[in-house]
Amino acid sequence: MVRPPCCDKGGVKKGPWTPEEDIILVTYIQEHGPGNWRAVPTNTGLLRCSKSCRLRWTNYLRPGIKRGNFTEHEEKMIVHLQALLGNRWAAIASYLPQRTDNDIKNYWNTHLKKKLNKVNQDSHQELDRSSLSSSPSSSSANSNSNISRGQWERRLQTDIHLAKKALSEALSPAVAPIITSTVTTTSSSAESRRSTSSASGFLRTQETSTTYASSTENIAKLLKGWVKNSPKTQNSADQIASTEVKEVIKSDDGKECAGAFQSFSEFDHSYQQAGVSPDHETKPDITGCCSNQSQWSLFEKWLFEDSGGQIGDILLDENTNFF
């Protein structure tokens, strides 16, 4: 059950307090102290309820109450506490001991609430305007950031390529001088082509003459061996030598060709002074065969007697092949 309010009792006075009532209440509280508000009306003889006595003391008669306008710090405290606690003005007044809960409530309803609503409306309008104005700027800022990031990535890639190139050059130090030498040779090759073209013919004739001199000496050595072996090889060698001599005569440099031909003619002259002829070349081979035949005469006689003259015919046929 809910307790009925004390103000509804018969004989209780309502309305504003008179100065005489204030003096009676203040003198009683100074003697007994604030508290036990139910006994105050009966003890003082006031025709007021206990609640009215408490509120009159707390909001108007107690010492240290600050009157007048609220400071900026007090306004911020009230706004912050009202957002946290709501309309609990007595709890809010406990954080501001110089202000009463009734004064805080009245000041909130008359000034702070309207002021706060106006500030919120202005802030919302500013936010809307800033959002509308910042939409193209934000897109441009994003595009600029993307462009700057792309440029930075390109720079990074180029720096990486340069670093790779420098690393490859550092790891292969022999490549750089080769490249420089090739560049210098290619630049100087165009200048030296004309000078080298004139000397190329002389070098070619010199090379052919030197190779021919060496080939004539080799042919002379081979001719000596061919003279001992068979006359057929000598004829073929003479033909080869004559054809090579003709080719040398057709060359450009006449002096070197004449010297080579002279060396070959001197070799031929020395060979003729030795008195060697194609008929005489095969005779030493026959004498060697005859000497070998005298050594094996006893064996041949025995074979001739045994085979009935067949060996003699074979030996005569073999000797005829040497002629």
UniProtKB/Swiss-Prot annotation:
Induction: Up-regulated during hypersensitive response, but no expression detected during compatible interaction with pathogens. Specifically induced in the inoculated zone 4 hours post pathogen infection. Up-regulated by jasmonic acid and salicylic acid. Transcriptionally regulated by BZR2. The modification S-nitrosocysteine is found at residues 49, 53. Residues 119-151, 182-208 are annotated as: Disordered. InterPro entries: Homeodomain-like_sf, Myb_dom, Myb_TF_plants, SANT/Myb. Residues 130-148, 182-200 have a biased composition (Low complexity). Residues 9-61, 62-116 form the HTH myb-type domain. One of its GO terms (molecular function) is DNA-binding transcription factor activity. Residues 37-61, 89-112 bind DNA. Keywords: DNA-binding, Isopeptide bond, Nucleus, Plant defense, Repeat, S-nitrosylation, Transcription, Transcription regulation, Ubl conjugation. There is a cross-link at residue 283 (Glycyl lysine isopeptide (Lys-Gly) (interchain with G-Cter in SUMO)). It comes from the Eukaryota. It is found in: Nucleus. Transcription factor that binds specifically to the DNA sequence 5'-AACAAAC-3'. Acts as a positive regulator of hypersensitive cell death. Acts as a positive regulator of salicylic acid synthesis. Regulates very-long-chain fatty acid biosynthesis. Acts cooperatively with BZR2 to promote expression of a subset of brassinosteroids target genes. Transcriptional activity and hypersensitive response control negatively regulated by PLA2-ALPHA. Involved in the regulation of abscisic acid (ABA) signaling. Interacts with MIEL1. Interacts with BZR2. Interacts with PLA2-ALPHA. This is Transcription factor MYB30. It comes from Arabidopsis thaliana (Mouse-ear cress). The gene is MYB30.
